[in-house]
Amino acid sequence: MIKINISQNFLVAKGHALFAEKGKDIVCAAISGIIFGGVAWFEPDKIEFTENKLVPSIALKLIDPTPNVAVAFSVITVQLKAIANSYPNHIVINEESYE
């Protein structure tokens, strides 16, 4: 199962979806595509991004959350939630309150 922790300025995704065998897992591919596609949009000085293929995990932290950066991060979050709603046995999202 992929576990995703999301806050106002960061997200961490860990694990495998285990929807299908390695290389054919559409759920893992969707999550990776959303996160890596989002990362490609950000200017490098606006974020910190790390990937660990051994664990596996991906972490994204906003360094300079300007309004445009915040909107882009929200889009990533909405997309991840859509996949989680479609595949609840393979993805769980925990949101930290930021009020």
From Swiss-Prot:
GO molecular function: cysteine-type peptidase activity
UniProt xrefs under SUPFAM superfamilies: TM1457-like (SSF118010)
EC main group: hydrolase
GO biological process per UniProt: proteolysis; ribosome biogenesis
Keyword Cell membrane part of the UniProt annotation: no
Coiled coil: none
Active site: H16 (proton donor), C28 (nucleophile)
Pfam families in the record: Peptidase_Prp
Keywords attached to this entry: Hydrolase, Protease, Ribosome biogenesis, Thiol protease
EC number, UniProt record: 3.4.22.-
Subunit (UniProt): Homodimer.
Family: Belongs to the Prp family.
Function of the molecule: An essential cysteine protease that cleaves the N-terminus from ribosomal protein bL27.
Protein name, UniProt field: Ribosomal processing cysteine protease Prp
Source organism (scientific name): Mycoplasma genitalium (strain ATCC 33530 / DSM 19775 / NCTC 10195 / G37)
